[in-house]
Each structure stands twice: as structure tokens, then as C-alpha cells.
């Protein structure tokens, strides 16, 4: 909320995010340990990072109805090769690529998903790192880079050390991190950023017609909104 408010409230956002990071109750997944875990024990939901999640027995079946065709072999939510190149920049070591199988998302539908109890993450530790990094981006770019680096080390071994952080770098991690969680639209809206498509040419330009809901006709007529 503070991050969306902007201005001096950004300082509150980064302070509270780092309080969660430093509290010791949550931990980022270990990349090497996750990579070397057999398929039956892979936790694609990153459960240890969940600060708050919604649980329900129908998460898997509901996700199957959205993320893949029950009667076919292909998914109806596809990651085109062009989008993968834009998103991962050729980094095939990123553990989050395990969320995709045969072009559909298996984040919530993998065979072992019920082992970790069906759930939908609402707030995760990784989000705290991204909030803190964005909050420090202008005032202390080196610290922001350290935060982003720590998160990336939990996701891939292909790390390039950076001394600074840009909005585009943070947005790129958000796009990789929030797959299937319904967050990205609101990130694009908050930043008034173009929505990225499968290629750099087929996205949606940021505008009020995309991000601002029109007033109902009754509100205009009876609410003195002209």
C-alpha cells in the first residue's frame, strides 16, 4: 500500500519490507537444494517463502481448468519462445522455468502439489525483497542491488553482479516471480508501464483506457460527475 502511495511513503514501504526480511521467520528457497531435489519432493510453490497464502482443496483442479486443457495435451496458457527470451534473457538455469511444462503452467498442478497442500500465495518473502529494492533504488542503489542480488541467488546460478538497480530490472524479476498469481496487472498500473507481450512489438501501451475503470453511467448522471 505504501509503495502505491509513493512520495515519502516509499520509505515506510522499504522499512516494513526489511522488517519482514530480517525477522528470521521466513527464508528464501535454497537454489542448489531445490535443483537437486527429486521430482516427488520439488516444491514449485516455494512454500517456505509464503508469509500469507490462501488454502483450499480445489486449487489444483481449478488451476487445471485455467492453465491447461483437460481434453488435450497442449496448454491454453502458453509461453511463446519470444516471451521466454524477453523474460529470462537466455538464462536457462533459472529455477522458475520449472513452473512450465509442455507450454502450460504447472505451478499449481504438478503431480506432487498436494504434498505441499494446495494453496495460492498472497504475500511472499520474495515480494518483500522486490519492495525493498524498489524502495531503495533512488536513495541507495548499491543496497537495492544487494537485495535484488540476494533474491536472484535463490533462483538461478547465472548471476551478474550489478552495482545499481533500475525499474526495468525490478519489473523483470516481478514478471518472472509472480507467474499465475494475478499481481502483474496492478504492478503495470502502479508504474503506468506498458504491458509486455510475447514480443517487444505486441504489448499494450499504458493509458487510462487500460488502467482506469470508467465511471458507471448512473454515477455520471446522478452523482454530478461531468
What are these regions (language model features)?
Residues 1-68, 74-79, 84-226:
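Acidic/polar-rich alpha-helix caps and helix-coil junctions
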Amino acid at each position: 500500500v505504501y509503495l502505491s502511495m509513493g512520495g515519502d511513503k516509499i520509505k515506510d514501504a522499504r522499512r516494513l519490507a526489511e522488517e519482514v526480511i530480517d525477522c528470521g521467520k521466513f527464508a528464501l528457497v535454497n537454489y542448489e537444494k531445490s535443483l537437486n531435489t527429486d521430482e516427488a519432493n520439488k516444491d514449485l510453490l516455494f512454500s517456505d517463502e509464503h508469509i500469507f497464502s490462501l488454502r483450499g482443496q480445489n486449487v489444483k483442479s481449478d488451476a487445471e481448468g485455467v492453465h491447461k486443457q483437460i481434453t488435450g495435451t497442449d496448454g491454453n496458457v502458453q509461453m511463446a519462445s519470444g516471451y521466454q527470451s524477453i523474460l529470462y534473457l537466455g538464462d536457462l538455469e533459472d529455477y522458475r522455468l520449472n513452473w512450465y511444462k509442455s507450454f502450460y503452467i504447472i505451478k499449481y498442478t504438478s503431480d506432487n502439489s498436494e504434498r505441499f497442500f494446495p494453496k495460492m500465495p498472497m504475500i511472499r518473502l520474495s515480494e518483500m525483497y522486490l519492495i525493498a529494492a524498489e524502495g531503495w533504488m533512488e536513495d541507495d542503489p548499491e543496497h537495492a542491488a544487494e537485495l535484488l542480488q540476494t533474491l536472484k541467488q535463490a533462483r538461478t546460478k547465472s548471476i551478474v553482479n550489478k552495482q545499481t538497480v533500475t525499474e526495468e530490472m525490478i519489473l523483470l524479476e516481478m514478471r518472472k516471480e509472480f507467474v499465475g498469481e494475478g499481481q502483474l496487472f496492478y504492478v503495470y498500473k502502479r508504474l503506468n508501464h506498458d504491458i509486455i507481450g510475447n514480443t517487444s512489438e505486441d504489448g499494450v501501451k499504458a493509458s487510462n483506457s487500460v488502467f482506469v475503470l470508467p465511471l458507471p453511467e448512473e454515477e455520471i448522471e446522478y452523482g454530478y460527475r461531468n
